[in-house]
Design a protein with these regions (language model features):
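Nucleotidyltransferase catalytic core that binds NTPs
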Residues: 1-163
């Protein structure tokens, strides 16, 4: 894999009632998180597509916009376990390699993965974005959960405590 594109998605259709920050704020947070990672690029590509946002539509648009590139999709184990509920999962699998990243509490049977789907043996991240958002809503210290640039932004915006 030459580089990773972080697609900031307007809304996950499977997460009804989710409270999201405005698109511009989420995009800026992603850019802060990726700062200093030379092979990670934050993209607003998906924000310019029709809503609701569906992965098959995004991947189809990426293939059309960049016909010389090959795209893989990285999803968490939690999303892989509901992948059959996504719109057009067969189209995604027909055109893209799918990498499943481990998530605490979600077990994936590697022997049952279809062709083109690879379970990535990688370190578990200690916190999910949901846990960070919940801590921010409760006004808790998130200094152990996020990079310094994100912490600085959240402390200023949400008046959070620091160590």
């Amino acid at each position: 894999m030459e580089e990773v594109w972080l697609m900031v998605s307007p809304l996950n259709p499977l997460k009804t009632g989710a409270q999201l920050s405005p698109d511009a704020e989420r995009l800026e947070m992603a850019r802060l998180a990726a700062a200093g990672l030379p092979d990670v690029h934050v993209s607003d590509f998906e924000m310019h597509l029709p809503r609701p946002s569906y992965t098959w539509r995004t991947l189809r648009a990426l293939r059309a916009a960049h016909p010389d590139m090959e795209f893989s999709l990285i999803v968490g184990a939690d999303n892989w376990l509901v992948f059959d509920r996504w719109q057009h999962p067969e189209e995604i699998l027909a055109h893209h390699r799918l990498l499943v990243y481990p998530r605490p509490g979600f077990q994936v049977d590697e022997s049952a993965l279809p062709d083109g789907v690879v379970y990535v043996h990688a370190p578990l991240l200690p916190f999910s974005s949901t846990q960070v958002r919940e801590a921010v809503r409760r006004g808790e210290d998130i200094s152990e959960m996020v990079p310094p640039a994100i912490l600085e932004r959240c402390v200023a915006r949400y008046k959070l405590p620091t160590e």
